């Protein structure tokens, strides 16, 4: 039998159950609201990624940047090592990282302060330098003119180099040999001189030195001493200078290169007087015995020299330069020869001098008038490693001439040109 008390208890239980159901509904509702708040729509499309996916993307980006940075650093290090291996003379490069790319910046040119050595090509990575020594290997405390020195190029890592071209004041003087790695050098003038070492046109090192006036060399004894009164020149250098100083040059004879032309001119003294004012650029026309007509601007004279080499080895003369004057002091011409090998003993050498036709006409008229006509020669032989060997002498300018069939005209003045 259902009593009121039973009904009351049932209502209480139902109320409690309803409250529990409502409580459960309130707990789930905020999750839906939270999703709606984080899900904005734009034209019906979702523009925001879920929170978990966004966090994952952030982590991926950071990992990617870190990986890319590590990769770029390794790439830079590998590139730096590769550059140094492939180019030992190439200067170090500074790289600036921007978005994975590298911009190269050349380093400043290498300069060794206090040694006046500069690499003008921003190369090399090593400090090459130029060294000047005496032939015995000692380093002089000063550089003097007319002295023999050896030039070397030194690599601090491997030592002396070979095959490097050496220039002094822009003039090529030689290439470092493969045996000793040296080039002989003589400074002929005092003052500042710049030595450069080049490899295939690239300047490896440069050195500027001051060359002092040389001390006169006397009887094979050096007059250069160090602070302890010791002679610092080697015996080899003294012997070399002594040998070169003993080389002598003599004027042996002067003769026409073509004696027929001289005879032809001597037979026409009036003609010789008439050409006194003619410029040698125009010349004169002469008909030879065989009917050949030539335009004569100069008359060539051969100056025969004797060069005495008392040494046991041959010596190469770089060049011989001489000037010819007549006995009245008039300049007649200049001659030059180069690259002459002088063997031990006496060596005949001929230097040709071209005398303008109007000046030669004057000298022939003097000779026909009975005067003694001499040529005075002054010149120098330039020998590598020893400097200048001066010489002088005189000889008859003309051979005996035939008496012309015509009276001699008055002697004109010496042509100005």
Swiss-Prot record:
Residues 86-106 have a biased composition (Polar residues). It is found in: Cell membrane. Its main location: membrane. Keywords: Cell membrane, Membrane, Transmembrane, Transmembrane helix. Residues 84-106 are annotated as: Disordered. It is a multi-pass membrane protein. This is Uncharacterized protein MJ0943. The chain crosses the membrane at residues 10-30, 148-168. One of its GO terms (cellular component) is plasma membrane.
